[in-house]
Curated annotation (Swiss-Prot):
Changing E167Q: No effect. Loss of activity and affinity for RNA substrate. The gene is endou-a. This is Poly(U)-specific endoribonuclease-A. Changing H162A: Loss of catalytic activity and affinity for RNA substrate. Residues 8-285 form the EndoU domain. Optimum pH is 7.5. The lineage of its organism: Eukaryota, Metazoa, Chordata, Craniata, Vertebrata. It holds the Pfam family XendoU. In vitro, optimal manganese concentration is in the range of 5-10 mM. Its cofactor is Mn(2+). One of its GO terms (molecular function) is manganese ion binding. One of its GO terms (cellular component) is nucleus. Keywords: Endonuclease, Hydrolase, Lyase, Manganese, Metal-binding, Nuclease, Nucleus, RNA-binding.
């Protein structure tokens, strides 16, 4: 393994595979959704908003929305996606209704086996308090507490917005958006134009049933040269992984190497003080671990 990739974390690999197996809300490839990978994406120079289009059709060919929205954690998650102002530098205003939606989502995921297992693990590590309510408050602060991305500006971002919704830097640079449901919904609204897959070095092309992908896309005219995302997994699965990695370290940037099913991944979590700045999976066989 290359030295800059770090050593495999066996403890987290075991835990994350247990969480993967417990993820009962995960959508199944070929049954609950279908994707079309099409062509391999081209190189996009830094700062460019031009990308060769190697995909004539959307990435998502089909998603069983009825099933998606019948699952409480997905339904409450989707209700949060329209609560944010896309541009950093524009102050966020959080309404009482949005606070209630945040709490409904946390209540829903805390009922799942995945989050109960994650909570139990964190309690054993003295990284979370044993009561569910205290853990919920901790999750709320980590993920939903607003902060400023630029020094001196008003609160304009939070971990949830960056990771799951996506945001822009002065309307010129695409940041975040590492979630497959948001990708699908934005693609459906014609806000996302999928440009092609970014291949792993040891594999000529991904498979249609791969559940971790590197993608290139335009979002509202801004290019994301490489965006990595789990596909099909539940919101609670991603919340669990990223929260565990965040709480395990005080480092500005945590990179935990894990083996999850067939994938060797780096789970990257960047902290913004006491909050999550960004979080995403990186397929280690790609040559660009520094996705943003």
């Amino acid at each position: 393994m290359a030295s800059n990739r770090g050593q495999l974390n066996h403890e987290l690999s075991k835990l994350f595979n247990e969480l993967w197996d417990a993820d009962q809300n995960r959508m199944k490839s070929g049954k609950d959704y279908r994707i079309s990978l099409q062509g391999k994406a081209g190189y996009v120079p830094a700062g460019s908003n031009q990308a060769r289009d190697s995909a004539s059709f959307p990435l998502f060919q089909f998603v069983d929305e009825e099933k998606l929205k019948s699952r409480k954690t997905f339904a409450t998650f989707i209700s949060l996606l329209d609560n944010y102002e896309m541009d950093t530098g524009v102050a966020e205003v959080v309404t009482p209704e949005e606070i209630a939606e945040n709490n409904n989502f946390l209540d829903a995921i805390l009922e799942t086996k995945v989050m109960k297992m994650a909570h139990d693990y964190l309690v054993r590590k003295n990284q979370a308090k044993p009561t569910r309510n205290d853990f919920k408050v901790q999750l709320y602060n980590i993920w939903f507490q607003l902060y400023s991305r630029a020094p001196g500006s008003r609160p304009d971002s939070c971990g949830f917005e960056h990771v799951f919704v996506g945001e822009s830097k002065r309307g010129q640079e695409m940041m975040g958006l590492h979630n497959w449901v948001q990708f699908y919904l934005q693609e459906k609204r014609k806000n996302i134009d999928y440009k092609g897959y970014v291949a792993r070095q040891n594999k000529s092309r991904p498979d249609e049933d791969d559940q971790v992908l590197n993608l290139q896309f335009n979002w509202k005219e801004m290019v994301k040269p490489v965006g990595s995302s789990f596909i099909g997994v539940s919101p609670e699965f991603e919340f669990a992984l990223y929260t565990i990695v965040f709480l395990a370290s005080q480092e500005k940037m945590s990179r935990e190497v894990v083996r999850l099913e067939e994938y060797e991944l780096q789970i990257v979590v960047n902290r913004h003080g006491r909050y999550i700045g960004t979080a995403y999976p990186v397929l280690l066989s790609t040559n660009n671990p520094d996705l943003y």
